[in-house]
Amino acid sequence: MANSPQAKKRARQNEKRFAINKARRSRIRTFLRKVEEAIASGDKEAATAALRAAQPELMRGVTRGVYHKNTASRKISRLAARVKALG
């Protein structure tokens, strides 16, 4: 348990940031799930549109510190390859 005032404040800040980051991660995962579902259905147009919507969301997560840049790039790259393979 935090004893000093500074430690108590940091604990409060951590809880607040955890909740914010959790919401951001959830939002990004929703966008990624839409791409996955479009790929699974075999609809290339829907998958392309979903990927276009997911890319800026993922990169926004990088800017906000939710994801590492390489992680987001890897996710986008793999999804793009799968969408391209739908042909």
From Swiss-Prot:
Q: Where is this region: Disordered?
A: 1-22
What InterPro entries does this protein's entry cite? Ribosomal_bS20, Ribosomal_bS20_sf
Q: Which GO terms describe its biological process?
A: translation
Q: Name one GO molecular function term.
A: structural constituent of ribosome
Q: Name one Pfam family in it.
A: Ribosomal_S20p
Q: Which domain of life is it from?
A: Bacteria
Is Membrane among this UniProt entry's keywords? no
UniProt keywords, alphabetically:
Ribonucleoprotein, Ribosomal protein, RNA-binding, rRNA-binding
What are the record's GO terms for cellular component? small ribosomal subunit
- Keyword hit for Cell inner membrane: no
Q: Which residues cross the membrane?
A: none
The UniProt entry, under Gene3D superfamilies, shows:
Ribosomal protein S20 (1.20.58.110)
List the NCBIfam families hit by this protein, alphabetically.
S20
Function comment: Binds directly to 16S ribosomal RNA.
Q: Which family does it belong to?
A: Belongs to the bacterial ribosomal protein bS20 family.
Q: Which protein is depicted?
A: Small ribosomal subunit protein bS20
Gene name tied to this protein = rpsT
